[in-house]
Amino acid sequence: MTNTTMQPNRLRIALQKKGRLSQDCAILLKQCGVKINWNEQRLIAYAENLPIEILRVRDDDIPGLIFDGVVDLGIIGENVLEEEELGRRAANETVTYKKLRQLDFGDCRLSLAVDRDCHYENVKDLANRRIATSYPYLLKRYMNENGVSFKSCLLNGSVEVAPSAGIAYAICDLVSSGATLEANGLKEVDVIYRSKACLIQRAEPLESTKQALVDKLLTRIQGVQQAAESKYIMLHAPKEKLEKITALLPGVENPTILPLASDTTRVAMHVVSQENLFWETMEQLKEAGASSILVLPIEKMME
């Protein structure tokens, strides 16, 4: 039975309690072999097989928990992290933390948008205009970098309605597909910040057992991400075409070459390769003489 008492020797990780990022974090931990007892009614969860406890909090609370040393690790969108950091620095507060790794989920962009009928050429068109946003510090930095004065209107939700409601001329908000902007009669005109989820650590040194666990998690996360970006490929190749076929398959290491039973002219080739443009690559492999091409997903990798 899992001990659910908060203990100082557990590695404490802050995660968003709801939403897509929360789901992606749960999947990542599972892929890394961390077994968590999730309970939607509880804000603290515990790992069954490792000394880890999860604090499930609001996403905008995670940077502060890291900056203040309350938790050891956090997974957070870079947009939220940088907005909080800029806000604290504007208040002359010291901000220290370690950014360990960018993750392969949580993609979004922070963009400027205006009414679809507005004429817009560049950010200078927003000079002295009122812009509604939930990210005032990221917006201010971008506008300052471009030498544009503006009026900021802070909204913590429903930013898209600001132009139609007469609250602001433009908005600066997170965009994924752009469907919400279109539904509200807006058009995206400038991307000011691109973001992914990232893993961060508090600045104060961890005790050796905790740091060893962090290092173990980092190795596993790297393996999960590399596996997601790669495929295991098996094929048959004429011996005289090996060099040409190998050149078409840039893998993480040299391919494994195996003899084929009762066939002295061909060999079997096994390789881990990137999936990028792989349909085109398969066609090139076939043209080069490869056959019996098999592409398999990889669940885990460790170099």
From Swiss-Prot:
The keyword Ribonucleoprotein is annotated on this UniProt entry: no
Activity regulation behaviour: Feedback inhibited by histidine.
UniProt-recorded Gene Ontology molecular function terms: ATP binding; ATP phosphoribosyltransferase activity; magnesium ion binding
Catalytic activity as recorded in UniProt: 1-(5-phospho-beta-D-ribosyl)-ATP + diphosphate = 5-phospho-alpha-D-ribose 1-diphosphate + ATP
Localization in the cell: Cytoplasm
Entry-linked InterPro entries: ATP-PRT_HisG_long, ATP_PRibTrfase_cat, ATP_PRibTrfase_CS, ATP_PRibTrfase_HisG, HisG_C, N-reg_PII-like_a/b, N-reg_PII/ATP_PRibTrfase_C
Entries under Pfam families matching the protein: HisG (PF01634), HisG_C (PF08029)
Pathway: Amino-acid biosynthesis; L-histidine biosynthesis; L-histidine from 5-phospho-alpha-D-ribose 1-diphosphate: step 1/9
Cysteines paired by S-S bonds: none
Keywords assigned by UniProt, alphabetized: Amino-acid biosynthesis, ATP-binding, Cytoplasm, Glycosyltransferase, Histidine biosynthesis, Magnesium, Metal-binding, Nucleotide-binding, Transferase
Gene3D superfamilies: 3.30.70.120, Periplasmic binding protein-like II (3.40.190.10)
Main location per the UniProt record: cytoplasm
Cofactor: Mg(2+)
SUPFAM superfamilies noted in UniProt: GlnB-like, Periplasmic binding protein-like II
EC category: transferase
GO biological process: L-histidine biosynthetic process
A cellular component term, taken from the record's GO annotations: cytoplasm
EC number of the protein: 2.4.2.17
Family: Belongs to the ATP phosphoribosyltransferase family. Long subfamily.
Biological function: Catalyzes the condensation of ATP and 5-phosphoribose 1-diphosphate to form N'-(5'-phosphoribosyl)-ATP (PR-ATP). Has a crucial role in the pathway because the rate of histidine biosynthesis seems to be controlled primarily by regulation of HisG enzymatic activity.
HAMAP family according to UniProt: HisG_Long (MF_00079)
Name of the protein described by the UniProt record: ATP phosphoribosyltransferase
Gene designation: hisG
